[in-house]
Each structure stands twice: as structure tokens, then as C-alpha cells.
Amino acid sequence: MNSCHLQFKVYASGVIANDKKVELHKTFRALGMSSIYDINLTGLDKGKMAANLGDAHEHIVAGILIRLGFDVGIVDVSGTKYDMLVIAFEKPPPDGKKVILRAQLRTASRSVSFIGGGRGGIDREYKSGVKTRKFTTKDSDLILAIDRSCFDVYVIPTEFIARWGNSKAISKMQPLKNNW
């Protein structure tokens, strides 16, 4: 069961909720939708839709960070080991100096994978020797994992994952949820 919640008031189709925290998936069911992440109105094939979701999640996370006051740049070059640059501060302004953080974005449902380098989607030509690797501090400073069903963002210092396995359940990372 997902822990994502949404404050809402809906006055359509006989659904009324008065500022109660309602689990997101129940909200979407009440509105006639199954969930936010499995709506594919255009009928794209599964591989293309997965790639599009990854791109969309990069922009959603960038938007959240910008709304929080961070400067963000999405890296639009394939093959890089990080997805975005985030300008943060060592200490709160005005005393703290700016620091540029390399961030790797991951989409999470029940867990976050810390493995990269694999080929997503449909590969029309099989090539052996594709190298997957676990992210390290040589690759990025942060892993930003977005929960695909409610857009909570888990802010994970890359140095943490050196002690973890190849993935971790988001239920075990609650202190990192939206911890800016």
C-alpha cells in the first residue's frame, strides 16, 4: 500500500471529501482513473512510454526543485552519468557558498534501483556486453528518486548507496522523502 496522500475537495460525480487525507490511488479510482502512472491515452508501446515517463519525471523533479528556489539544469546529452545539475548551498544563504551537485534521477514505485547503464525499451539489434553498473560518487552526488504514483522525491546522497544493495524499498527511506 502506497503512503502517498493528497488533500482534495471534489464536487463532481457525487464525490465529496473535506480536506481529509485520502490515499492517492483511491482518489483516482473515485474520479474514474486507476492511477496517475498508467494513463497512456495515445497508445504508445510500452518501451516508448517508459522512456517518456523517465523524461517527464526529470522535468517534474526539475520543476519541484525550481519551485523550492534551486537553480536546476537538465543535462540533455545521452551517455552522461548524471541527469541534472542542481545549485545548492553549503549553508543557508547568505553565509553559504554555492555548490554544484550532479544528480541522477530514478523513477520509483516500491523501490529504487541504483543500477544504471542498461538499455531501456525495445532494442531492435541485440548487442552483448552491455555494461550495467551501480552508481557511485564518481557518477553523481545525489540520487533523486521520484515516486511515480504521487511525485514524492527521495533525496539520496550517492555515498549512502555504497553501503546498500542494488536497490532499496522506499518504505525504508522515509527520512529521505522530500527532505530538501
Report each predicted region and the residues it spans.
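Mixed-charge (Asp/Glu-Lys/Arg
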Residues: 1-80, 86-180
